[in-house]
Structures are given as structure tokens and as C-alpha cells.
């Protein structure tokens, strides 16, 4: 009996060492993230890219969407920024963002909801009512906003605010704090010209299910020119793993 117990213990120890040596690298969703400015509970494959010094990531649980934006001090009057997230859950939304600093951006989809964040002291969650953007109560949204000592921002958005969709399309961007000049946007195929109103063309689209990693989130376009070989080559090169999986 003791001999079998020793074998069982050895198997448990070996299995534990194997798991610790090869941690989960799939980055699948259904993650619960603590909104505290500490990114250690994020998986590396939740990461969607980095542009002009800002990193962007997305994951979700059964009840919430989670985002991080890393690399920006939102309280700096000179280098600070405002961040925007827009969401489409149906075709009955608006193709223009809510005016901010007197500028509206063209969106790549019909957006039903938007989140605009200046800093932890002020943000707006808006819903399209068919003719205009309305600010609605959003006390359950949780934020940690990056500052000079920790430039990692985290956002928790309850899915109930979006009508508990099973699929979602979204995009994000940051613009100057006191102007509407966009300096970073995601997906990264979008413009970020820092010149005012933008015409965004690309967005993320995904089912909100378990076992989906960032590499499986689709990047779609509302204005892809099929006769433009250069654009097609760029898109295929940047997203080759996704297209390869489609062809397999």
C-alpha cells in the first residue's frame, strides 16, 4: 500500500512541475480582471497591439468586458489624452461618434454605445437612441486611470450596459486632451493622423464566448477596396495567422 502511495505522490509532484513549467499560454477569454492598475492578471495573448507608445488589450468574462490601455499619463496637461471606446451590437446605431471638443469622427460600423474617458474624475457612457447620443447612468463601470507613477489604465464595463450581446464589434482610439486630434487607434489599420476628424475604417468583431483568444478576434473593414493590391498585401501580412486558420 505504501509503495502505491509513493507512486501516486510522485505522479502528483511531476504533474505539478509540468503545469508550473508550461503555464497557460492560450490567453482564452472568460477572465476576471482586478481593476487596480496591475496588469499581472492579464494573459499576454489578450494583447491586441501597440501604437505610438500605447498598448491595448481586451478580454471578457460572462458578465463584463475588460480593457487595458498602457503607456499614457491621462492627467498630464501636455502629454495627456482622452480615450474612446465604441461598440456595435446591432445595425441600428450611428456612424458618427458623439461630438467631443466639437468634432465627430466617422465610425466603421453603426455604433450603439460609446465610452469616453477624460480621467478618473470624468467619463461618459452614451447610448444611441435613434437620433442622438444620450448620456446614461454608469455607476457600475470601474476604472483605474494611468498617471505619471503608473501609466496602466484598466476598464471594466458590465455587459448588461450593452444589452448582454452574444457578439460585439468595437474599436478604440485616443486623442489630444484639449483637441480632437487622434494619435493612436485600434485596430491599428485605422487612421491616427492627429489632424482632426478621422474616417475610421476597421474594427474588431468577436463572439463573447469562452476559449477565444485575441488571435481569433476578427478585424473587419467597412471600406476595403478589393482592387487595391497594396492594401490587401498589408492586411494579409499583418493578420496572416488569422487568414491561414481560415484557409486550413
What are these regions (language model features)?
Residues 147-194:
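Ser/Thr/Pro-rich, low-complexity mucin-like regions
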Residues 174-223:
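A recurrent domain-boundary module in secreted/ectodomain proteins
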Residues 37, 64-72, 152-158:
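Short, well-ordered beta-strand segments enriched in hydrophobic/aromatic residues
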